Amino acid sequence: MRWVALSAVVAALVSISSFGFATVFQVQPGVFDPDGTGIVTAQWIGRQGLPDDVGKANQALFLQKDGPTSANASAFAVIGGVEGLTITELGFDYKNDGHCGAGAPRFNVTLPDGRYFFFGCIYGKPQAPPASGWTRIRWNDSEGTVFPAGNYEWPGFGEFGVVVQSIAIVFDEGTDVGGGSVLLDNININGSLIGKPTVRTP
């Protein structure tokens, strides 16, 4: 039930943040906290991420759930600009002192027919690390494991990719199963690395 309510929030934000520009990706942090617990945080933080190609902001996406996993609260970030996009690869870098669990942080990917799928952090395929103290993970047609939210199967990226309706990063595992927070950088959509709130692709 928690994801059903959160998915409605994500859908609303996708319609706001995509603007119909296929060449612009936006990562919009938010929190789902209907009970007012105050334990979830989602924000971009400067000087905490990996070095940027341009500028010195070096931002990272901070997601936190400072309480039990059972609490009806989630930190998330909606990826704008993906509605109707054919995706062939997903991934991100995470700082090693943060939490990487089966369910958080994760990509929630919704297809146009309403089916949605979970890409949990520990099920991504580790790559060569981008820097000391960081881990890079990927999902594509040959790497990573994807789990369906219902009685259906992930269609696979395939040779030509899969069309999506929305993508969000969700963090809803609390301090009872890990550290309760993570720093993410270089969010990967089809090879485009997003390390700040808005990125224009080539």
Describe the residue ranges of each PLM region:
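Short carbohydrate-recognition loop motifs
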Residues: 47-74
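Bacterial N-terminal signal peptides
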Residues: 7-17
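Extracellular ligand-binding interfaces
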Residues: 80-82, 86-88, 94-157
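Extracellular beta-strand ligand-recognition surfaces/modules
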Residues: 104-107, 131-200
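Extracellular carbohydrate-recognition regions
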Residues: 21-46, 195-202
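Positively charged n-region of N-terminal signal peptides that target proteins for export
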Residues: 1-4
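Short, flexible beta-strand-to-coil junctions
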Residues: 65-69, 111-114, 170-177
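Short linear interaction motifs
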Residues: 69-76, 88, 181
